[in-house]
Amino acid sequence: MHLFKDSLNLIVSSGNGGAGCVSFLREKFKAKGGPDGGDGGRGGDVIFKVKSNLKTLSLYRNGQKLSASNGKSGMGLKKSGAAGSDLIIFVPPNTSIYDADSNCMLFELKNFNDEVVVLKGGRGGLGNVNFKSSTKRTPRFAQPGESGLTLNLRLELSLIADVGLVGLPNAGKSSLISKITASRSKVANYPFTTKIPHFGVVRVSYNDLIIADLPGIIEGASKGIGLGFEFLRHISKTQILVFLIDVSSNDFMSAYDILINELRVYDIGLLKKKRIIVASKLDLEGATENFNQLKSILSEERVLGISIYDNIGINELVSEFFSLAKI
C-alpha cells in the first residue's frame, strides 16, 4: 500500500539535443563528395499530464530525479538523429506545480487529460551539410546539441476529495466510508485507526464523488498535538466537511466545540467551507435524545442523524453530499 502524499518535490530535466554530424559523401566515382552530416535529434520534453484514476502523488518519491531522454547524434547521408523520448509525469486532478526555489506557481492542472510542457528539450545541433557555402565547400565542423534544462519543482494537491469526514477518534468515520463506498478503511475500537486519509468513491447515476476518511482530530491538534498539522492540512483540501459526532456519548457538544475550535485556531477560513453535522450511532441507547438536543442547539446548521448498522439516514446523507457538491 502506498503512503498518502499530497505534496512533494521533484527534480526534472529535459533531454539534451543530439550533436550534428560531420560527414562527407563517399561513393564510387565521387572521391570528393560534399558534406552530408545530418542534424542531431531534439531532446525529450518534460510533460505533466492529469490521469483520472490518480488520487495522490504516491507514484513518486520526495526529491526524486526524473529525466527525459537525450536526442541522438546526426548521421551521414543527411540523416537526422532520433528525437529523445518525452518524460510524461502523471498527476491527479487539481495539482499545482511550483518552482521550489522561488515558490512561484508555474502551472495548475485541474481537469482530466489536462497537460502542460514544463520544460522543452534541447535543440539538436546542425550537421555540417548546413554550413556548406561558396567559400566553405568542405566544412569540418557541426553544432553540438543544445543542453536540456533542469527545474526543482514542488507539486501540491489543491483538492484531495469532494467530501472530508472529520471527527474525534472513534466517531465512526471509517465505518461510514466503508458503508457508503467501496473503500475498506480500517475499522477498530481504538484511537487513530486512520493515520493517513483513505479514499472511497460514491457513484450515483454515473456521477462520482470522492470521499476522504481523514485522521481523527483531538484537542490541541492546531498546536501539533496528535496527528495535528498534517490532519488540518488535509482538511483544507476538501470541498465539503462532514463533522461526525458520536451522540451515544453525553459529551456530544464538547466534541462539536473541539472540532470548531481547532479549525478556527488553525485557519478560520476552514469554517467558511460547506459543512454537514452528522450525528452517528443512533442505534445506541440515549442517542436519539442527544440527537434531538444537538439539532435544537445547532438549529442554523445542517444536522442529519445516521445509524450505520440499522441503515438509518444513509441515503439521505449521500443525497446531501451530491446536492452540496452540485454534481
Curated annotation (Swiss-Prot):
Assembly and oligomerization: Monomer.
Family: Belongs to the TRAFAC class OBG-HflX-like GTPase superfamily. OBG GTPase family.
Keyword list, A-Z: Cytoplasm, GTP-binding, Hydrolase, Magnesium, Metal-binding, Nucleotide-binding
Pfam families referenced in this protein's UniProt entry, alphabetically: GTP1_OBG (PF01018), MMR_HSR1 (PF01926)
Enzyme Commission number(s) from the entry: 3.6.5.-
Keyword Endoplasmic reticulum: no
Alphabetized HAMAP family for the sequence: GTPase_Obg (MF_01454)
Protein name: GTPase Obg
GO BP, sorted A to Z: ribosome biogenesis
Name of the gene: obg
OBG-type G domain location: 161-326
Lineage: Bacteria, Pseudomonadati, Spirochaetota, Spirochaetia, Spirochaetales
Localization annotation: Cytoplasm
First-listed, main subcellular location of the protein, grouped into a coarse class: cytoplasm
GO CC term, one of those recorded: cytoplasm
Natural source organism: Borrelia recurrentis (strain A1)
Residues the record lists as binding GTP: 167-174, 192-196, 213-216, 280-283, 307-309
Cofactor: Mg(2+)
Residues at which Mg(2+) binds: S174, T194
GO molecular function, one term: GTP binding
Enzyme class: hydrolase
Function, in words: An essential GTPase which binds GTP, GDP and possibly (p)ppGpp with moderate affinity, with high nucleotide exchange rates and a fairly low GTP hydrolysis rate. Plays a role in control of the cell cycle, stress response, ribosome biogenesis and in those bacteria that undergo differentiation, in morphogenesis control.
Alphabetical list of SUPFAM superfamilies matching this protein: Obg GTP-binding protein N-terminal domain, P-loop containing nucleoside triphosphate hydrolases
Location of the Obg domain: 2-160
Chaperone among keywords: no
